[in-house]
């Protein structure tokens, strides 16, 4: 969740389901499962349409990759193979409260920005912009806190295939150039230990 902080937030309101893609910050507090914080544009109807106290779902998409049947050694033996998709995802269920407080928002976006700028050679800080401009921008957003009630990890990493096919997938993905292939290969290799 921390490694891939763009959550798909699914809520229900008077107009039905609503899905938003929101960068968030995951916190360990309150125990036992923690919370998720974020902000949305004030113009986004989510904060007005959300039925207070109703369940919400935050989906964190992990690595995912198409798996060609050509990676399976069993293709040459039986030909009984088809393509699939391997993936890892986390579903966080909880309830939300919206926060329309300028000081809370300033503190939150300062911390969120610092976390995402930390690895840069010259990190941008909220204080780099004129205070009046930041004040104006803060009036255009609403914060939220999502109290996590349950976490469910879902993954499919070719674990249903015979060991030889799993090893073929690991070898094939390790030779790929993208990060998702390498992450799925590592998950499958770790599972086989």
Please name every model-derived segment.
Residues 1-193:
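Binding-site signature for planar aromatic cofactors or substrates
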């Amino acid at each position: 969740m921390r490694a891939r902080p763009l959550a798909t937030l699914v809520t229900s309101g008077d107009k039905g389901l609503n899905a938003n893609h929101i960068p968030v910050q995951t916190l360990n507090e309150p125990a036992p499962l923690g919370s998720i914080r974020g902000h949305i544009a004030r113009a986004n109807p989510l904060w007005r349409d959300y039925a207070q106290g109703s369940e919400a779902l935050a989906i964190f998409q992990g690595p995912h990759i198409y798996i060609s049947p050509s990676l399976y050694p069993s293709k040459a033996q039986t030909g009984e193979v088809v393509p699939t998709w391997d993936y890892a995802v986390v579903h966080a269920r909880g309830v939300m409260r919206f926060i329309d407080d300028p000081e809370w928002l300033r503190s939150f976006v300062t911390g969120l920005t610092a976390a995402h700028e930390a690895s840069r050679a010259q990190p941008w800080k909220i204080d780099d912009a004129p205070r009046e401009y930041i004040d104006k921008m803060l009036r255009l957003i609403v914060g939220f806190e999502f109290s996590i009630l349950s976490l469910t990890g879902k993954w499919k990493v070719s674990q249903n295939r015979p060991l030889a096919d799993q090893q073929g997938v690991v070898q094939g993905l390790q030779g790929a150039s993208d990060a998702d292939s390498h992450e799925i290969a590592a998950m499958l290799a770790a599972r086989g230990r």
